[in-house]
């Protein structure tokens, strides 16, 4: 091999997994595919009416594999996902030659997918070397009315539109694809030592867009820098942010792989005019007809993925929130269809924000998604102080519409003088139609308090009912057993599907005494299904880290590895391999266990608090490139000390920062370019004191 066995950034194997679902994905902010798969997906392009809405499948010209030259013996074959360059490499090596295929979704040119083939002569002979290519392409799609158009500058041309839009009367989205035809074989000539061929696929929403994007790619290809610019872009991304530990290689690889797959879905930092269509559980590479929910937007985006993105890339986080702003009209319609005021964000949404979940019960009852959406806006506001999003760009409309829905949805109980929320399904989907889900009701309270505080900041009137409901909504609590029942009538010992009550405290801000936090963790740890989704154990790990129990935290971190498949670190939704694959939701929860659990980071109105802890098997944690209030910050700690450094003021308006340490209340200036180290301590990163 090449030493990649010990490299946490490169994942290699001698053969591909027997299950093609677990093959690596290559994705950018516009296009996504799985290597050697017959389908490409385009961000925001769905086919099928409500209940059947799924990502439209475009046939993939990248579905090409190298084959061994005739008569080759002693062949070595490797398959590698290189997260450093965001590319997948297949290499065939014999005694006299090396042939390699590289596949990538171009990071700088998001409308472009590329595969290249390189052949190198390893001996002094001069015989031609011919490498066969096995291509499997048919210009057909079950989701698109496609037609073959005239060639364009030697490229094939396919164009058409989706068959059935999400809503009747909507325009049928157009798709235009140009690609370079692939020969049956490539030959290195007698006098050549090495050669590389590049094959481009370009996709756009119009013929003109596809042709313009091809012209841009061709210009880079002519200069010989098409791949270099892509790889350099990934290099800059990794140089600007990261999350690593001194610990087991498997943990380091899981962290790096999760960052790679999540960041693959985002635009390059600084990209202008990016329009987000949301982040789905299976990412852009998944979501075809038989896997429709993998491509829909759930709470997964707002609770599980968003906090990681916000910490490193606030501009991408803003674009994700803008998806919720753009689909607010659909959310308002959902609320109206249920008979309530305000916005009810869809349990599963696609282009319009209208409910596309094929089963009514989830759209009707899993209303906790509203609280997840509001929480994402709240965290963004605290972390960036970007009031423009709320004053001018629709953020206030989302927050206030969620508040209106909650006030319309609750019922007043004259018996116990509290507001109740009846007939809901909590995150624990084993229970439906319950009253007063504690998780949901805490989110209601949080959403309403934030709406009132935001109104005050923006100089807007505060609805009295918001605070009345927030202060008087029922939060179930058993004072005798000192824990929070999941809902009214929950009996201890009942099995639950996944993390639910244990989300109180983190990621949902809610004050808990250590005793109650511990009792919640112990109660639900004993009854959570081992078949539950991947992010569950990460949240138990966060809880135990809050309580300074590194051994129990490590147990739950380790449980997450049942969902990580080899060799390409593709996550599955469930430990038995079922459910969504390339499961970004599980990756997001796992990343939060390190990024928020180990560090103790909590985003608050006053600053970013920290309370670091190394789990068992980890001696050091390093976080680089978090972006707080326009400042780039590195944060690292061991069991004995903490080091902080503001590496740059990325925005001209960025304020000076300081670290306030607890319990001493010492204030340490964070001067850009100067590292500040101190004995292991909790504290807060905040604006410098006047």
From Swiss-Prot:
GO CC, one annotated term: cytosol
An annotated Gene Ontology molecular function: protein-glucosylgalactosylhydroxylysine glucosidase activity
Protein keywords: Glycosidase, Hydrolase
Keyword Membrane: no
List of catalytic residues: 429 (proton donor)
Statement: the UniProt record of this protein carries the keyword Ligase: no
EC number: 3.2.1.107
Biological process (GO), any one: carbohydrate metabolic process
Pfam families reported in the protein's UniProt record: Glyco_hydro_65m
Uppermost EC category: hydrolase
Binding-site positions, substrate: 299-300, 497-498
Catalytic activity: (5R)-5-O-[alpha-D-glucosyl-(1->2)-beta-D-galactosyl]-5-hydroxy-L-lysyl-[collagen] + H2O = (5R)-5-O-(beta-D-galactosyl)-5-hydroxy-L-lysyl-[collagen] + D-glucose
Function, in words: Catalyzes the hydrolysis of glucose from the disaccharide unit linked to hydroxylysine residues of collagen and collagen-like proteins.
Family recorded in the similarity comment: Belongs to the glycosyl hydrolase 65 family.
Name assigned to this protein: Protein-glucosylgalactosylhydroxylysine glucosidase
Species annotation: Mus musculus (Mouse)
